[in-house]
A protein has these predicted regions:
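Pyridoxal 5′-phosphate
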Residues: 2-511
């Protein structure tokens, strides 16, 4: 804590190291094993401790998980698809056990199948769309005609990540954004009107986020599931943002509120980086004779004359080639860690932290928190400083304070239009300039996202850092030059340490 205490002493701030709450103390047993805690780097303004507040983008390595994979799983690493040798058999069993742990965690039924693929939710939602037969090759689009009355209709919220919006726009489906209330929440009356409007469509899908990755606002996806099921539709839920922190239950007590499919990104879990995306869906949705990735492990028999028979089991059929068994094992281990921390503890601790953040940031005169009226949220705060480029703020927080945040639209550009009140004419003007190579007017914000393992003193430090940047950005900006091509701010004299750092990482990889 020396970096933090020295900072406040230097700035003559009244900073008493607070006594940790019971929950803060509870989470310290997990905090001490996070790789990177206390790590420093050399900034243009001296040595800084990394204060990580970018959890919505990625989780962090957890040392016991990395050591377990290395020391316990490692000696038995081998390809799966065999139960004869000890190594192959052990890995095959470990892979299947990991899959079962994931299924149990989301309360999947015997009729639900699991597919792990890609690097996160983006990979599995695109795979799911192909499995559903909703994707047509770009080269064939001009030769494919689907009458409007036969096109699936997909309903999304205004809060979606690009992966749960643009991916649907590239299918044969029509996509409708469900209108929101003045409060910024989904309007269910409007949703029901849309369902009536499209009542004759053969396939009706609601694909919605469980939680905004911009504001931390959670959606009532069970209510949405119940409504669309009553209209003969399907409900898919994107848990990419919230999966590390909340209960996931595909089959709640209200039978009409079941979820037909879910997807999430385990790399966002503590301990999860390096894992695959996860998709779980009801097998009734699978109508395919040919797997999405035909290959090793998907066939029962082939011969030289072109005959081939695919396996019947859906999970095996859609797991072509060598599966990502280590990625799936890591997902299971990070889920077990989440369960050990306890969802109730996680949520309650985040409420403690959120209270501090709101109290401190709302006092900064030139700072605006997006959707600030919604205080019941996960620990995600997106904000902007009036008339200041978001990436300048991110850079100053990094260089002067070591605070890791993220600037931009958080891959939620459509939601940004709602939050920043960007009308269509203004949007078109911005788009035109972006296409011409001018990025400076691209809308965005600064996002900080916390984890229950962060300490109160770190939270106070982050908030004080933001306050100082908001007060001093004009003077501090003189140290930087704006790069319009990269839309980034570059320090005028200091060499980027990242180049030397990364080159050093790869120098001794074989030693």
């Amino acid at each position: 804590m020396s970096f933090l205490s020295n900072f406040f002493k230097k700035e003559n701030k009244d900073f008493n190291m607070s006594q940790p709450s019971e929950l803060e103390t509870y989470f310290q047993q997990f905090r001490k094993n996070i790789v990177g805690i206390g790590h420093t780097f050399q900034s243009p303004f001296g040595e800084k401790e990394i204060i990580y507040t970018d959890w919505t983008a990625s989780g962090r390595f957890y040392r016991p998980i990395e050591e377990k994979i290395l020391n316990e799983f490692g000696p038995f690493i081998a390809n799966t698809h065999t139960e004869t040798s000890i190594t192959g058999s052990a890995m095959t069993m470990a892979y299947h056990k990991a899959r079962n742990i994931i299924k149990q965690h989301v309360n999947a039924s015997k009729d639900d199948v699991l597919i792990a693929d890609g690097a996160g939710m983006t990979g599995v939602v695109n795979k799911f769309q192909r499995i559903l037969g909703l994707k047509v090759s770009e080269n064939l689009k001009n030769h494919t005609t689907v009458p409007d009355e036969l096109r699936p209709i997909v309903f999304i919220s205004h809060m979606e990540h690009h992966s749960n919006q643009t991916s649907w726009l590239e299918t044969i489906a029509n996509v409708e954004i469900i209108p929101c209330q003045d409060s910024g929440l989904i309007c269910f009356d409007s949703f029901e009107k849309l369902l009536i409007k499209y009542k004759d469509r053969p396939i009706k899908i609601a694909s919605v986020t469980a939680c905004s990755n911009v504001t931390g606002i959670r959606t009532n996806y069970y209510k949405m599931a119940k409504i669309i099921h009553q209209h003969g539709g399907l409900c898919f839920v994107d848990f990419a943002c919230s999966a590390p922190y909340v209960h996931i239950d595909m089959h709640p007590k209200d039978e009409e509120s079941y979820l037909d499919a879910i997807f999430f990104s385990p790399h966002k879990f503590l301990g999860g980086p390096g894992s695959s995306g996860v998709l779980v869906f009801n097998k009734k949705l699978y109508k395919n004779l040919i797997p999405d990735n035909p290959g090793g492990g998907t066939v029962n028999y082939t011969n030289p004359w072109g005959d081939h028979d695919y396996v019947d089991d859906i999970e095996t059929r859609e797991d072509g080639g060598t599966p990502g068994f280590l990625q799936t094992i890591k997902t299971a281990l990070s889920i077990q860690l989440k369960e050990k921390m306890g969802v109730e503890n996680i949520i309650e601790r985040e409420h403690e932290i959120n209270k501090i953040v709101f109290e401190k940031l709302t006092k900064i005169p030139n700072l605006n928190i997006l959707a600030a009226q919604h205080t019941d949220r996960l620990g995600i705060f997106s904000f902007y400083i009036k008339n200041v480029h978001f990436n300048l703020i991110v850079k100053l927080l990094n260089d002067r304070f070591g605070v890791q945040t993220r600037g931009g639209c958080s891959c939620a550009g459509t939601y940004g239009h709602f939050l920043l009140h960007v009308d269509q004419q203004t949007s078109k003007g911005i788009e035109k300039k972006i296409l011409e190579g001018c990025m400076v007017e691209r809308p965005g914000w600064i996002r900080m996202s916390i984890h229950p393992t962060i300490t109160n003193n770190e939270v106070l430090y982050v908030c004080e850092s933001i306050k100082q940047v908001a007060e001093n950005y004009e003077e501090w900006a003189k140290d930087y030059t704006y790069n319009s091509i990269k839309n980034e701010y570059i320090h005028n004299t200091a060499n980027p340490i990242e180049i030397e750092l990364v080159n050093k990482w790869f120098e001794s990889n074989n030693q």
